[in-house]
UniProtKB/Swiss-Prot annotation:
Residues 92-105 have a biased composition (Basic and acidic residues). It is found in: Mitochondrion matrix, Kinetoplast. It comes from Crithidia fasciculata. This is kinetoplast-associated protein 2-1. The keyword Cell membrane does not apply. Its main location: mitochondrion. InterPro entries: HMG_box_dom, HMG_box_dom_sf, Kinetoplast-DNA-binding. Histone H1-like DNA-binding protein involved in the organization and segregation of kinetoplast DNA (kDNA). The mitochondrial DNA of kinetoplastid protozoa consists of about 5,000 minicircles and 20 to 30 maxicircles. These circular DNAs are held together by catenation into a highly organized compact disk structure referred to as a kinetoplast DNA (kDNA) network. Binds preferentially to a specific fragment of minicircle DNA and is able to compact kDNA networks through DNA charge neutralization and condensation. The keyword Secreted does not apply. It comes from the Eukaryota. The gene is KAP2-1.
Length: 130
């Protein structure tokens, strides 16, 4: 199973091209972005496509690696039927992702700007100099 699905997790040159366009803001305000991106991708030169393919080979996300590791570990348990293993893998992966989201939200809430404290300290230092 995993031998076939690993290629589905890999980043394609086309997806890299889309993310590059999105980062530069060229997709904003376009009514049909898929059509626009497809047209632009087909217009790329061979050198540009080769560069994208090279970047795509090197691209790997931590989530892909973590999922592969978890899938390998879960699927190696041969005493459980394959459908059950898939269900367990899906359930555990969703729980992991949910826990990560909650952790990120908590960290985001805790982080506050130090701007007001810096301003107060600057005012105190100005007053003490006078």
């Amino acid at each position: 199973m995993l031998r076939r699905t690993v290629s589905n997790f890999a980043m394609s040159p086309y997806m890299l091209f889309i993310s590059d366009l999105a980062k530069t803001g060229k997709l904003k305000g376009i009514r049909t972005p898929g059509k626009f991106v497809g047209k632009k991708y087909r217009q790329l030169s061979a050198k540009e496509k080769a560069a994208l393919q090279q970047r795509a080979k090197q691209a790997s996300t931590p989530a892909m690696t973590a999922y592969r590791r978890m899938a390998h570990r879960e699927m190696s348990n041969k005493s459980v039927p394959i459908e059950q293993r898939r269900a367990n893998l899906t359930k555990k992966w969703n729980e992991t992702k949910q826990a990560q989201r909650e952790k990120a939200q908590k960290a985001q809430k805790k982080t506050k700007s130090a701007k007001s404290k810096v301003k107060k300290a600057a005012k105190k230092s100005k007053k003490s100099k006078k």
